[in-house]
């Protein structure tokens, strides 16, 4: 499998913040409590969580966690020009990018400033980089390469009902984007369509042909 799982103990003593780096991980995918050691609660996002390859605990949470992650893999970097004309939002898909590591300005073309997360950034959910507010630049973009990109797959929410489609060949979908929308209802990533593990989902009337990218076992 491209992703690995193991049990790791992380402990917040005296209710203080603590963290632990998963040495062979490039990105943690999920973290769940297997055996709580503390009287204090362990709540995802409040008293434990993760960012990139680092696990953290706080507020007295002490537990053994099941941690699944992408092991360290070779990265690829490329220079890509992305431009916000007339101060409008624009985006560009980075083909083959599974998880972005960083995006830095190499050569700014615009008078407008380019500030990370304000006028440029990236979305791991659909392998996309974006600019806004007049930022135009050549960016150095580094990322983990993806393994498999499929042809289009139709997933439809009929009568505004929630619907799913499993990709048996996938162990972990990392992006999903609309290729051809059939519904009048909007298809918005994270709201009316998305993915979990190897399953694509739609809701609230979104019907479209999607192009998912994924790791395969």
UniProtKB/Swiss-Prot annotation:
Binds in decreasing order of affinity: galacturonic acid, D-galactosamine, methyl-alpha-D-galactopyranoside and further galactose-containing carbohydrates. Has hemagglutinating activity against human and rabbit erythrocytes. This is Lectin ADEL. It comes from the Eukaryota. Activity is stable up to 60 degrees Celsius, then decreases and is lost at 80 degrees Celsius. The lineage of its organism: Eukaryota, Metazoa, Spiralia, Lophotrochozoa, Mollusca. Glycans are attached at residues 30, 102, 126. The keyword Glycoprotein applies. Keywords: Disulfide bond, Glycoprotein, Hemagglutinin, Lectin.
């Amino acid at each position: 499998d491209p992703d690995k799982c193991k049990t790791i103990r992380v402990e917040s003593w005296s209710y203080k913040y603590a963290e632990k780096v998963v040495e062979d991980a490039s990105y943690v995918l999920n973290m769940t409590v297997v055996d709580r050691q503390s009287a204090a609660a362990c709540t995802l996002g409040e008293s434990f969580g993760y960012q990139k390859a680092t696990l953290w605990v706080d507020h007295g949470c002490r537990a053994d966690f099941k941690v699944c992650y992408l092991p360290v893999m070779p990265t690829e970097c490329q220079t890509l020009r992305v431009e916000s004309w007339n101060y409008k939002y624009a985006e560009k898909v980075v083909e083959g990018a599974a998880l972005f590591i960083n995006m830095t300005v190499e050569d700014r073309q615009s008078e407008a400033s380019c500030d990370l997360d304000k006028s440029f950034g990236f979305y791991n959910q659909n392998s996309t980089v974006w600019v806004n507010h007049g930022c135009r630049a050549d960016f150095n973009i580094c990322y983990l390469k993806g393994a498999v990109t499929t042809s289009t797959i139709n997933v439809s929410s009929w009568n505004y009902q929630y619907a799913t489609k499993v990709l048996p060949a996938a162990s972990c979908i990392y992006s999903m984007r609309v290729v051809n929308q059939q519904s009048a209802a909007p298809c918005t990533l994270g709201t009316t369509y998305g993915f979990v593990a190897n399953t694509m989902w739609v809701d609230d009337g979104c019907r479209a042909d999607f192009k998912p990218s994924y790791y395969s076992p």
